[in-house]
């Protein structure tokens, strides 16, 4: 390749123009993008080894806000370079570095199922205990927390059902898999939680208007405090345990346990304060718990809706894909399109590459198929589609139907 020659990348979704390759930095026969040309400047906060505090750039920056933005920019660049290194490893070895073996995946799946079973068993036991505390205390805040535990059981069933459904594929009825069942199940569960939260708000408001507070004896108060405090501790430990996993369903349990820690703490505090000081603290606490539940799961619904409607991947991920594609094979003359979008919890990737017009079919097929296999090895990618063309001056061949 000549010293000033470079291959072009363009497309409606992602455009990149590479700089000419310098003869002094790269051998004439090199067609790959070299990571040696991508390095942080010596004056950057990260390259100087000082990630926090003031750096030598501070003399040029008048405000801490500007310095913070520069530091965040270099951190983002460092993360991008780490992604390029990962793509380079895939191109050199043919597989993802550090990818777990089949035996390790089986052990991980077994431990994830154990985490789900432990969470479901704990939710059932704590729900029964909190029902008793609700009956004895008649506290709206405790009742709101108990309803949240009931929803934990419902969510556990939904998440278990979706996880079990995804483990039993049916290539005839569901040719692209059942991964979409997970966000759909979470959306259904969140909708139920929001509905019950609204009922708690209405009942608590009725108590505030009627000025009818609950009363409990010292024995009932001790039972209520013991049950709610124990439930909070158990949920906190389960949250730490489930957060150690990367599986989306187990992490959804971790999020649910965190919500319970907050709602149990608020419910316990407001119930005790209502007994010691003012009766209206209890229904007010119940309203706070319900509002928190509704707002939290509303955000969860939005996140899962975005994952189902085909939202584009961030530019950094598209840049990683482009780097991987460009260094895949010497015969790739142009990258016409790099597109990645959500369709569930993972990305679908569409790539258009340009190969020589006179290339034999079997050679072009092998280049495209091996590239597809590399893309599908990425943990973020569920499926990849590689389209092969011999020119890139045409208009887009696929249009979205409205």
Swiss-Prot record:
Domain of life from the UniProt record: Eukaryota
Family the UniProt entry places it in: Belongs to the cation diffusion facilitator (CDF) transporter (TC 2.A.4) family. SLC30A subfamily.
Summary of the function given for this chain in its UniProt record: Involved in sequestration of excess metal in the cytoplasm into vacuoles to maintain metal homeostasis.
GO cellular component, one term: vacuolar membrane
InterPro entries in UniProt: Cation_efflux (IPR002524), Cation_efflux_CTD (IPR027470), Cation_efflux_CTD_sf (IPR036837), Cation_efflux_TMD_sf (IPR027469), CDF_Transporter (IPR050291)
Recorded topology in the membrane: Multi-pass membrane protein
A Pfam family matched in the record: ZT_dimer
Transmembrane feature ranges: 115-135, 141-161, 183-203, 222-242, 258-278, 285-305
Region (Disordered): 1-21
An example Gene Ontology molecular-function term: monoatomic cation transmembrane transporter activity
Protein name per its UniProtKB record: Metal tolerance protein 9
Keywords tagged on the record: Ion transport, Membrane, Transmembrane, Transmembrane helix, Transport, Vacuole
Vacuolar side: 136-140, 204-221, 279-284
Cytoplasmic topological segments: 1-114, 162-182, 243-257, 306-402
Subcellular location: Vacuole membrane
């Amino acid at each position: 390749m000549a010293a000033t020659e470079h291959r072009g990348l363009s497309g409606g979704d992602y455009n990149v123009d590479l700089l000419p390759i310098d003869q002094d930095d790269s051998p004439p026969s090199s067609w790959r993008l070299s990571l040696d040309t991508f390095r942080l400047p010596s004056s950057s906060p990260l390259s100087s080894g000082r990630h926090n505090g003031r750096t030598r750039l501070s003399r040029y920056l008048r405000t801490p806000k500007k310095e913070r933005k520069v530091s965040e920019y270099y951190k983002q660049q460092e993360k991008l370079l780490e992604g390029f290194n990962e793509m380079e490893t895939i191109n050199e070895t043919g597989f993802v570095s550090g990818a777990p073996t089949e035996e390790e995946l089986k052990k991980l799946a077994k431990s994830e199922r154990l985490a789900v079973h432990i969470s479901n068993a704990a939710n059932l036991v704590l729900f029964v205990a909190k029902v008793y505390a609700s009956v004895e205390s008649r506290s709206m805040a405790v009742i709101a927390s108990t309803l949240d535990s009931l929803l934990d059981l419902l969510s556990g069933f939904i998440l278990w059902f979706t996880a079990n459904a995804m483990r039993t594929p049916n290539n005839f009825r569901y040719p692209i898999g059942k991964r979409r069942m997970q966000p759909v199940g979470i959306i259904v569960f969140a909708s139920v939680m929001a509905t019950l939260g609204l009922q708690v708000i209405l009942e608590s408001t009725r108590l505030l208007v009627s000025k009818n507070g609950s009363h409990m004896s010292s024995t009932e108060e001790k039972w209520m405090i013991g049950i709610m405090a124990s439930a909070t501790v158990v949920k906190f430990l389960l949250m730490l345990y489930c957060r150690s996993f990367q599986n989306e369903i187990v992490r959804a349990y971790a999020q649910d346990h965190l919500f319970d820690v907050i709602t149990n703490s608020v419910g316990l505090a407001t119930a005790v304060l209502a007994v010691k000081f003012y009766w209206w603290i209890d229904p007010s606490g119940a309203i706070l718990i319900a509002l928190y539940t509704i707002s939290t799961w509303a955000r969860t619904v939005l996140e899962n809706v975005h994952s189902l409607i085909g939202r584009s991947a961030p530019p950094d991920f598209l840049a990683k894909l482009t780097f991987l594609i460009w260094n895949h094979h010497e015969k790739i003359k142009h990258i016409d399109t790099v597109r990645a979008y959500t369709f569930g919890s993972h990305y679908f990737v569409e790539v258009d590459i340009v190969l020589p017009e006179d290339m034999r079919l079997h050679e072009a097929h092998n280049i495209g198929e091996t590239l597809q296999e590399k893309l599908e090895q990425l943990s973020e990618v569920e499926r990849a589609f590689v389209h092969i063309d011999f020119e890139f001056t045409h208009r887009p061949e696929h249009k979205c139907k409205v």
